[in-house]
Structures are given as structure tokens and as C-alpha cells.
Amino acid sequence: LGLCCILSGIMVYVPFLRYSYMEQMIVIFTEYKPIVSPDHAYEFLGDIGAAYGTITMITYLFGGLIADKFREKNLLLAGSILMGLSSIWYGTVPGKTGLILIHVFYAIGTGILIWSAFLKVTRKMGTSKEQGRMFSISEMARSILNMLIGFLGVAMLGRAVIGDGSMDPQV
């Protein structure tokens, strides 16, 4: 359960980094590696979110079918690899098309591979009478892990902020 919660917590957190770190991402995409003009930066981040949301909504339709046909362990592993490789690519700050593709891969990883398998694993952990407790425990563990990941992100961001309030993306 612990590994599944870590995976599902990160899976939910990473595609939505733009909500927590919007201003920092604007600096990176307009100053550090200018791939979009400052006038269109917010629109670009919205386009990334729209690509992710649209594809995820479509992939959820197939996630349950895929989870019933393949072993959960294999789906979680494939989703982890896809999300990990996409996140490494994201860290290199590719161009516009690359960032949109990364979010399409995130949508496939979360919607088809990870989320349905995670729900199936959680459901299998207890009897029908224990389902409420199993899902409550998994949500609690996911929330605690998301909080810790958020603190780690803020700590890393704190190291990148210079004393005058500006950013040093090289850190």
C-alpha cells in the first residue's frame, strides 16, 4: 500500500505543478529558457493543462478495461516508467511541443496505467465490508505523502530564490 500511495501521490502532484509553482514556471519559460513570450505565458500554461485534462478524461474511459485485462503490478510499473521518463524530460525544459507531449504522456500514465490499477489494488486489499477503511487509509497515506512532497518542493524552491526575491534557475 505504501508504494502504491507514493506512486499515486506523485502521479497526481506532478502534472499539476503549474498550480503550485505558476510564477516560477513563468520565469523558467520566459527568461531562463524562453520558449514563450511573457505576454502568452499564462495562456501557454493553460494550453498544457487543457491538453492534460482532455486526454486524461478520455483515457479514464479505457483505464478500467485495461486494469481488468492486465496485472496491476505491470500497469503500475509501466505507468511509473512512463511518468518517470516524462518527468525527467520535463526537467530539461523542452520546447512547446515537448511540454505538450509530456502532458499527454502524463495523461496516459495516470488515466490508463496507474489510477485504475491503484484503485483495483486498494479494492483487493480487503473484503467488501472493509472497502471503506481501505480507501480511507489509502487516501490518508496519499495525502500525507503529498504534503511531504510539497514540503520538499518548497525547500528546493527556497534554495533557488535569491535574497532580493529573484530566482536563480541554475540551482
Please place each PLM-identified region on the residue numbering.
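Hydrophobic core of transmembrane alpha-helices in multi-pass small-molecule transporters
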Residues: S86, T97-L113
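Central cavity-lining transmembrane alpha-helices of secondary-active solute carriers
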Residues: D47-L65
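Membrane-interface helix caps of multi-pass secondary transporters
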Residues: L17-D39, T122
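Glycine-rich segments within core transmembrane alpha-helices of 12-TM secondary carriers
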Residues: G132-G158
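C-terminal ends and interior cores of transmembrane alpha-helices
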Residues: I81-G95
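Intracellular juxtamembrane helix-capping segments at the cytosolic ends
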Residues: I112-T127
